[in-house]
From Swiss-Prot:
Localization: Cytoplasm
Keyword set includes Acetylation: no
Species: Chlorobium phaeobacteroides (strain BS1)
InterPro entries registered for this protein in UniProt: Arg_repress, Arg_repress_C, Arg_repress_C_sf, Arg_repress_DNA-bd, WH-like_DNA-bd_sf, WH_DNA-bd_sf
Any Pfam family the entry gives: Arg_repressor_C
Sample GO molecular function, one term: DNA binding
Major location category of this protein: cytoplasm
Alphabetical UniProt keywords: Amino-acid biosynthesis, Arginine biosynthesis, Cytoplasm, DNA-binding, Repressor, Transcription, Transcription regulation
Family: Belongs to the ArgR family.
Entry function: Regulates arginine biosynthesis genes.
Pathway: Amino-acid biosynthesis; L-arginine biosynthesis [regulation]
Protein name (Swiss-Prot/TrEMBL): Arginine repressor
Cellular component, GO, one term: cytoplasm
Amino acid sequence: MSKQIRHRKIKEILLSSTVTNQHELILLLEKRGIDVAQATLSRDCSELGVLRSRTASGYRLMIPEDNPGQMIKGLVEMEIQSIESNESSIVIKTLPGRAHGVGSFIDHLKNPGILGTIAGDDTVLVIPSSVHDIRSILDYMQTNLLNN
């Protein structure tokens, strides 16, 4: 089964059904003749921008329809509490349990000045490609992670 077909089926299911978690999505895909490992489904959901959103009846997996990048940026903005730096790195403090999502968002921005991120529970360590780029990375983060 090609990734393209799997992605299309995932979109169809999420747009037509209330799906509360990935396990349920796997079962719905299996009913449609698509066998997929949980790790593969997790990657597919990430690539499609699938969000787990709270609704009046509980949680639901959803595909954002209007400008998903802007929607995710809005969520990231709400999760960041502070951004600080020293002469060698940048530390982002987030709401508890949200550092992984913020770190992943930063990684997906693919800024060449950022070597990578390491996320804990409420802290993201941003490692610059060069310590000489700290100021420009901070400016970049102000523009791309926070409300201006």
